[in-house]
Amino acid sequence: MSAGTNIWRILLVAGCLTLPLSSVRAETNAPAPATFTTPPTSDADRFFTQYAKAVQLVRQNGRQEASVIMDLLWRNLGSSPWFEIALLKHAELNEISNAQVALEDYDVLRKRVENAPYFQGTADRAAVFRAALLGSAMRGTDRIRIQRIRDALETYSTRYHQYPESLAKLAIFNYIDMEDIHNSEGRLFHYTPTGQRFTPAISYHTYVIEPLAPEPFFVSSPKLDGTTQLDDKTRKFAALIRVPGHMDPHRVFEDQTLEGYFVAAVAAGGAIVCTPEHVLVLVAPE
C-alpha cells in the first residue's frame, strides 16, 4: 500500500476525513437549475441500500463485485456505526481473496471502535456494539493468520515430507512470520502434530489446529419482516424480527434485547442486532 493511502487511512481512523457520495462537478457560468427540496439521505439509508445489493451479488457468486460495492460504501460513510459495520463487512468479503486488505480493514476498525465517541461510555448500546465489533475484528484477524499457518505448513510438508513439531519451528525456519502464529491476544495458536512415524527418527504426517468458523456475510436467521417509522417527526423505527424457535415476529425497538440478540440500530432499510461476539445485519424485505 502506498504512503498516500496509509495517510488517508490514518485520517479516517482519527475521524478527520470523510468522502462525499457524489463526485465534484466543474463550475460553470450557467445558471443553476431549479431544484426541489428532498429529505437528505442518511448514512443508515445508504448503508442498507448498498448492503442489500451486495447480498444479492454474494448469493449469485459475485463476491468480487459485492466487495467493490462495500469498498465504495465504507469510504463514503462518515458516521458511526454505519462506517464501522460497512468496513467490517468489506473485510469479511476479502479474507480469502485479498487477506492483506482484510487485515488493514480490521486494523482500522479496531482503532475506530477504540476512539470513536459513539462506542464510548457505559450505555448498553455502546458497550455491546464495542464488544461485538472488536470481537469480530479479532476473529477475522485470527482466521487470516490460521489460514497463513495452514499454507506455511503445506509448504514445509512439500519440502520435508512431514510437519514440524511446533509452530515456533515453522516461524524459526522462516516459513511464516512469528506474529502470525499468535492470535490477536498474543496467545500461540493451538497446534498438535499427529500421525507419528519412526523413519527412523520421529516424524509427523498430519496435524490438528484450532478451528475458527468463517463469519457469514449475511444471515437468514434471525429474520427481519419489516420496519415501521414511529412518528413523522423523528427518524426512529421499530422492527419486526423473527428469532429461531418462534413462529411469530416480535416488534422491537433500539436498545431492546430479544432472545439474546441486542437490537443495536433500526432504520427504514433494516436493523443491526448484536450478540457478545457477532454483528448481524438484517435487511428489510423489498
Each PLM stretch: what is its role?
Residues P40, D45-L72, N76:
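Alpha-helical segment of the N-proximal tetratricopeptide repeat
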Residues T41, L73-F83, L109-A132:
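Short solvent-exposed coil/turn linkers within tandem alpha-helical repeat scaffolds
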Residues V68, Q100-E104, Y118-Q120, D124-R143, ...:
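Extracellular/periplasmic head regions of type IV pilus-like filament subunits
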Residues I10-P20:
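Bacterial N-terminal signal peptides
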Residues I202-L230:
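Alpha-helical interface/anchor segments and their boundary "cap" residues
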Residues V58, N94-E95, T141:
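Hydrophobic/aromatic side-chain positions at a characteristic register within alpha-helices
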